[in-house]
Amino acid sequence: MNGFGLNPVPGQQRLSPDKTVLLLRNGPQQQRQIPLTQIRILIGRHDPPHTQVDLDLSDCETGDPPMVSRCHAVLQWQEGQLTLRDLGSRNGTRVNGEKLESLPDQPYSDIVVLQLGSRIKFGNLEFEVINSHE
């Protein structure tokens, strides 16, 4: 795994599944806090019976057509760290302004480790990684 590395920045507050949430920064559900307690969270839009996601962002969309893909990205807790991978989404995923690029000969991106304060964009939806007590 490369991307932004798996080693936390010295002095950086660690994330934990019981405290960490995604804070939606724009759209009709702005300020919504999404707990990240599951080990693996598939992010996208429900499209039954074909697509079942853990975090359905359909109600958060800022316009039409939707900018979030049916299977957009996956968040996962690995070895005590929160990681993110784009799953080949049409409108992309960005972390702190950097687009997650697909790996050579693969539809998905490399894994990126998120930190407290990381800014994430799924299509045109903006989120921030925060602790739930903030």
For each predicted feature, which ranges?
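Short, intrinsically disordered low-complexity segments
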Residues: 55, 78-79
